[in-house]
């Protein structure tokens, strides 16, 4: 595993011919209709009170991609990430957006089985985009991970309690990731932008 991480670092630092500006990291996160803030404030001497839902909840999966300038394309679905779901995301959302805005992008994914499915690889090969897989167990090398933390904080703030409200809230939560945030996430994960 150490050798795989070192090889990835060497390739991603430009030695292997990949400029950090070209990297687009793909990942997914699950959000629930029960998301609520973890901390609260109230006037001194009073207890902070808020309702926090328990019991029935619904999961929504958000698939997204992050480039050095921000979110490139995202989609939310009421399903776990499977090969058909990921294929649909690539085909309908991400690849058309990248063709329009970032034709030289290099897609980077973790090792989720849906990312390695033969139909997904066939689609990526046919698209003409280069793609790479992160070394196993390396979320620290994926800048979209801290991005998901910011998205979930925004969703907690909005407290969407229905699936429709959660889908609607995902858009503004994703746009909360600014270009400055994205650049910081890239730096945090060790990717430097060229001068």
Region locations from a protein language model:
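Short functional hotspots at interaction and active-site rims
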Residues: 1-195
């Amino acid at each position: 595993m150490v050798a795989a991480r070192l090889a990835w670092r060497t390739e991603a630092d430009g030695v292997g011919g990949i400029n950090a500006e070209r990297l687009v990291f793909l990942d997914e996160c699950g959000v629930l209709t029960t998301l609520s803030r973890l901390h609260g404030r109230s006037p001194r001497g009073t207890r902070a009170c808020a309702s926090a839902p328990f019991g029935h909840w619904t999961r929504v999966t958000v698939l997204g991609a992050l480039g050095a300038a921000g979110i490139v394309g995202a989609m939310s679905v009421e399903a776990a990430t499977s090969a058909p779901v990921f294929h649909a995301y690539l085909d309908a959302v991400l690849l058309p957006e990248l063709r329009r805005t970032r034709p030289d992008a290099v897609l980077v994914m973790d090792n989720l089985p849906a990312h390695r499915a033969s139909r997904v690889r066939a689609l990526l090969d046919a698209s003409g985009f280069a793609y790479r897989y992160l070394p196993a167990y390396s979320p620290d090398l994926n800048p979209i991970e801290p991005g998901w933390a910011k998205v979930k904080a925004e969703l907690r703030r909005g407290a969407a309690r229905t699936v429709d409200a959660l889908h609607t809230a995902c858009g503004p939560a994703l746009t909360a990731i600014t270009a400055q945030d994205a650049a910081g996430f890239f730096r945090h994960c060790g990717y430097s932008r060229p001068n």
